[in-house]
């Protein structure tokens, strides 16, 4: 009997500790000293540095965009190219790196379709469980929707763009079920990129830096979902991360990169999500 009581108390304490941690992180996010800079009309650049968020130092960079003033599209880099360079050459005003790709071959390993043409399909293996969301763009307007191999096989979109990625973290304000997603991928802290839609109708392009001990140590998927939800996100999709994570604006100095890529230099990637006037 005593063992049962002890176990119950232990579990309750663990539950409340987890709740307290979440509450502490929520408070840290909303009370952070967010440095805000208007890039151009309808687009804000926000950045915050945390001494401890989800137990480690963090650096978070966000572009908050009014979709009424801008259009979105996926830019294919052929061959691979840095997000900042490809986006600038394409005439974009802002961009974030896109979905997962084959480092050697240079092609996307997630479904990519533009104006009725299938450019790439989703690879088998882990990515079939990770890639369960989709950036859907019609007439420059962006949506985030669930995705699967079944939707991929049935897709007949003639106009617009479909880019699979994932996992899908939030839908209609609710945290998505991640039980079918690769646990190591979900639970390990990495640099992360994401796109989100807010309750107010804004679009967020988000990069959380990582792999910089003592400065920015990265975030896992549940933590990223929680952070975006606290920031007002309704729908949110994880993009390729790690050394690929890059947030760029033509209005920022030097190379225009808002975050600090984790490698020694900005990585060449297969595609990017671009913002155009």
Predicted region positions:
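Structural recognition of the beta-strand scaffold that forms the well-ordered cores
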Residues: 93-97, 135-136, 143, 196, ...
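Active-site-adjacent helix-turn-beta-strand microarchitecture at beta-sheet edges
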Residues: 101-186
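Conserved, well-ordered active-site substructure
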Residues: 106-129, 180-234, 244-277
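Short, solvent-exposed aromatic-acidic interface loops
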Residues: 76-81, 149-153, 208-213
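Conserved hydrophobic/aromatic beta-strand scaffold that supports enzyme active sites
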Residues: 60-64, 134, 168, 194, ...
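Bacterial Sec-dependent N-terminal signal peptides
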Residues: 1-26
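Short acidic-glycine loop/turn motifs at beta-strand connectors
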Residues: 65-68, 136-143, 172, 197-201, ...
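Zymogen propeptides
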Residues: 21-134, 143
């Amino acid at each position: 009997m005593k063992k049962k009581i002890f176990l119950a108390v232990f579990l309750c304490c663990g539950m409340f500790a987890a709740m307290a941690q979440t509450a502490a992180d929520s408070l840290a996010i909303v009370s952070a000293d967010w440095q805000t800079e208007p890039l151009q009309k309808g687009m804000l650049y926000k950045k915050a540095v945390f001494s401890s968020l989800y137990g480690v130092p963090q650096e978070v960079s966000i572009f908050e965009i009014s979709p009424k003033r801008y259009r979105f599209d996926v830019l294919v880099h052929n061959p691979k190219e840095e997000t900042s360079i490809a986006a600038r050459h394409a005439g974009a005003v802002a961009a974030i790196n896109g979905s997962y790709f084959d480092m050697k071959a240079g092609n996307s390993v997630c479904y990519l379709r533009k104006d009725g043409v299938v450019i790439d399909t989703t690879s088998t293996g882990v990515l079939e469980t990770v890639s369960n969301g989709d950036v859907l763009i019609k007439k420059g307007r962006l949506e985030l929707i669930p995705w699967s191999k079944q939707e991929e096989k049935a897709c007949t979109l003639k106009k617009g763009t479909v880019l699979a990625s994932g996992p899908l973290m939030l839908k209609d304000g609710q945290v998505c079920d991640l039980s079918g997603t690769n646990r190591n991928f979900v639970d390990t802290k990495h640099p992360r990129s994401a796109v989100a839609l807010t309750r107010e109708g804004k679009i967020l392009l988000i990069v959380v830096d990582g792999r910089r001990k003592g400065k920015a140590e990265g975030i896992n998927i549940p933590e990223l979902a929680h952070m975006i939800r606290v920031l007002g996100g309704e729908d949110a999709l994880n993009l390729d991360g790690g050394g690929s994570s890059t947030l760029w604006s033509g209005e920022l100095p030097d190379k225009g990169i808002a975050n600090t890529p984790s490698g020694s230099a900005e990585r060449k990637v297969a595609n990017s999500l671009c913002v155009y006037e």
